[in-house]
Curated annotation (Swiss-Prot):
Signal peptide: none annotated. GO terms for cellular component: DNA-directed RNA polymerase complex. One of its GO terms (molecular function) is DNA-directed RNA polymerase activity. It catalyses: RNA(n) + a ribonucleoside 5'-triphosphate = RNA(n+1) + diphosphate. It comes from Fervidobacterium nodosum (strain ATCC 35602 / DSM 5306 / Rt17-B1). Transmembrane segments: none annotated. It is an enzyme of class 2 (transferase). This is DNA-directed RNA polymerase subunit beta. Pfam families: RNA_pol_Rpb2_1, RNA_pol_Rpb2_3, RNA_pol_Rpb2_45, RNA_pol_Rpb2_6, RNA_pol_Rpb2_7. Belongs to the RNA polymerase beta chain family. DNA-dependent RNA polymerase catalyzes the transcription of DNA into RNA using the four ribonucleoside triphosphates as substrates. Its EC number is 2.7.7.6. InterPro entries: DNA-dir_RNA_pol_bsu_ext_1_sf, DNA-dir_RNA_pol_bsu_external_1, DNA-dir_RNA_pol_su2, DNA-dir_RNAP_su2_dom, DNA-dir_RNAP_su2_hyb_sf, RNA_pol_bsu_bac, RNA_pol_bsu_CS, RNA_pol_bsu_protrusion.
Amino acid sequence: MKTYQIGKRTRYSFGKVDEIIQVPDLVEIQRKSFEELLNHGILRILKKFSPITSAKVEGRREKGFNLEFVNFRVGAPLHSVEECKQRLLTYVAPFYATVRVTDVSTGEMREEEVSLGNYPIMTENQTFVINGVERVVVSQLVRSPGVYFVEEPTKNIGAKPIYLAHFLPVRGVWLEIMLNLNDETLYARIDRRKRLNLFLVLKTLGFQNDIDILSLFPAYLDVEDDYSLKQSEGIIILEKIVSKSGEVIAEKGSVLTSTLVEILREHGIEKIKVVNNYMFKTYMKLKEKLKMPLEENISELRAFMEIYKELRPGEVFRYNAAKSYWNNLYFNEERFELSEVGRYKMNKKLTNAYRKYLIEIEGRNPKSVERIEYEEKSNALTPIDIILVIRMLLETEKHPETLDTKDHLSNKRVKTVGELIGSEFERAFSKSIHQIQEKLATYTSLDKISIPSLINLRNVIASLNSFFATNPLSQFMDQVNPIAELTHKRRLTAVGPGGLKRERARFEVRDVHHSHYGRMCPIETPEGGNIGLITSLSVYATIDEYGFLVTPYRRITNGKLANEVVYLAADEEENYKIASVTIAFDKEGNIIQERVPVRYLEKIVYVHKNEVDLVDISPKQIVSVTTSLIPFLEHDDANRALMGSNMQRQAVPVIKPEAPFVGTGMEYAAAIYSGHVVLAKNDGVVKKVDGRKIIIHRIDENGQLMYDKKGNPIIDEYTLLKYVRSNQDTSITQKPIVNVGDFVKKGSPIADGPATDNGELALGKNVLVAFLPWEGYNFEDAILVSEELLEEDTFTSVHIEVYETTARETRVGPEEITSEIPNVSKENIRNLDENGIIRIGAYVGKQKYFTSQDILVGKVTPKGESDASPEEKIMRSVFGEKGKDVKDSSLRVPHGVEGRVIGVHVFHKEEVGDLGPGVNTLVRVYLATRKPLEVGDKLAGRHGNKGVVSMILPKEDMPFLPDGTPVQVVLSPLGVPSRMNIGQVLETSLGWLAKLTNRYFATPVFDGAKEDDILPELYKVRETLNLHHGDDPNNPSGKVTLRDGRTGKEFDFPVLVGYMYIMKLIHIARDKIHARATGPYSLIHQQPLGGKAQFGGQRFGEMEVWALEAYGASYTLNEMLTVKSDDIKGRTEVYKAIMKSKNLPEPGLPESFKVLVRELKGLALDVRVYDEHGNEIDIEKL
């Protein structure tokens, strides 16, 4: 067993594999992408549109100006991240560009640095702060541009397939080349609508003679094959056929006839070169349509005429206009852009076809073309592209296995944050070009040009702000705990702009594909409608320069491990035989077994050890970070592992975090890269530590303390966060884990964040569990817990909620924040300061009696003049403004909330600037609430084993061990077999061994502890502590005899007991429970609102009405539909009657009936209501 040190903790690892590369920077994908955008991307976009010119020719001279962008830099951020969060600002920095303006006529130049405006930038934690809120831009998985060979689905049963070569650009009109095997013809489909004969398209590529085009698509006929010859009668021959004596038998371009076949046989000619059958039939169909004889060439003019007639019907044909229109469609980079990625993919795909073309058409030597790559540079299509694609398409009939799989990762690329923001910037900037040109054209002299006034990118700033605020890929950050944050930054989504639609995504798109191995996690994905569309990056996966996912492998040469690591994309991997890293190696790195299972293409095959090319880098390579935190993952069903992965992200940080006894070794990396653990920036010695600050004196390479020239110590100061609210209202608090005098290394943790313990992720607690049914209290996944967990605050968490109120300008005067509130006793304002704002440290929300809720911010709103009585007017004239009537509109603590005020922020319009329309003052109050474990709270393990607390039992009534220790949690044993998550059983036993031996274990995924490593060792330790009763020494099971805490009697059978890591999830009962007596009503139908947020009521729907009807409970039903709902007059009368202890009045007419009548009147129907005597009733008065 290996050991490794993490800070002050030693972990014992069961892992057998030595990993030669460390876990990479887990948020590199976000950081690198944004850095690339700032360092190169923005300048590349600015230069793409340079020069912007206003030059025009006057007489013989060119006049005007050229404007070009020479350089670009980013200034310092305007505010700190903390300030932006407090003041609800966006974290921005100014962008500057060096602009050069050139006078075209004189060549004179002027250069000046101008501001492009303030733009949102990434924080050190790879997030964006937009209007005070942290957001993450998620990476998007989209189809890569390029060319795809696919089979088009046909609706006709029994029909032959239609093969497509599909050119997919980043921008421009789609072009598809179709091979229809039913009518044996080739077509070009333009923009998924218009279909043309393919020969017309080929004619526009610059070929004069038809035979030259046909020669590009040859086929070879065997003269002895009667069937093929009969099928090919009438086909065009593509070469001059000469007999052995030198006599010309047939000229190039002649037609194959039965007579010619006989002559060929007589002369002993075995093979002849003819036109491909499908190309010939395509050509003949066009000839028939155009009613032209075979020997006559189709002119380029005629081809353009036919194409134009199809694409622009009804328009007058002009040759130059038609040629320009067609060339702009596919051969102009401004209209049709493949992009650098699309060109790279296309060149890669067409390389073999190009080599074949060089041999067949240009007659090159096969050996000379072996190393030639297809290296076309244009970002638009070229004639040779189209020819090579057609040649490949013609081969798909014989080799359908060469067709592309849409769901293969080689056909998908990742658009990272930098690219998404860059394309938004480019789109907005392209709209500003015309405006700059127009301004530039107004100037006549270089000296008079004001460069800053030329560059006004207000629309670009607005567009980027809109992107961050509204784009589905810019998301409100999941910040429940550090792993939730880390996972959000590593998320891949296939939905969003330019991606898939959730409703239309096929099962195949969502499914796990073999190319995902080591790139995308096959386990971590949501359970709902997004399943398979939103995924997570695997641990070691990264992105190459073109946006394709790559994963590392280690080379194997002649069955021996090499130290070389290679990163492969999904298509490159297909050519190699790759073994798992868990196969057996000797000490020198040689593979021990003769035959090894390897991944090759889509299959797993057995090969000789010398045939193995590569080996995985790590057993956890296949899964994501969250999934790699599940111990014994290999023993869990995939569906439960999925739930375990997702629930770890919902774990609430508890007051005293505790690292798991049974980890996987990934806890350290997950915590470090989450951004919540404070890391030392340099080597040093700790000089000062308190709850808010750590000061470290730097040391040099020799271990000597460093001082500046004046003799002052060079120090690093770290400020810790205390009770900061996260996006999900959990508390972010950092606490030091170093002492004065400690030596710290660069990069080592010096302070823990939320849910971390000594630099390791700590999402839950190690608790003593027993798998035992107990009086039905753990029926159906319910959980029985001990009162001990409450006494020790095991699952108590702190949540910070923010409440805000604004003082606005109203029509009758401004609202005022004050402690002088009408009709409020001194008792209720005892915690308010002189300004009417609650003092920090006050405990609010604890209600002893049915009194009004505590006031957080006292606020009064002036009443309108119109509703002032004559008496009030006299009072006002006597006392002036002091007598002015106001109504209480204070901010109060909501129902069911209690906690301590930990912060108050007041913003005044004069100091901050704009707070919103009509707002003078904004007050935010932060309330910290302590939430201990309660009945109804959701608990979960790491194996998808979740449940709700059903009862909190006194610890003396809990089942107890032979030494008297009561268990803390009782789980149902029926939750294990059907769920097939046996990992929890192994974790429980290993957890007990860890506790008894005072050790922490690591059991890496797919390389962890076996049952035989745990149970015999556990039995030995239990025997020394006299805890072995109920277990078999020859075949230990980890079970023990338990006694009932209430009776002291033994249970009938031994019970599995041990320590399991359990988390409390964000689904807290206290936040969901809700009750209403009287509350707000909907304005139109006057029924109570719904939901806790609106302090709403319970909906009594039509099915509930049927239930009361079925029981004949007429009075109850009458009440439900009237006075308890929308009978306005009736419910007021009932309230009065209850308060005065009188009999309840008769119900009146519900508002919903009036609404129905009004709706019918809106349909121009005259609806009248009559009583039993036939008198008309005015329902508006009822």
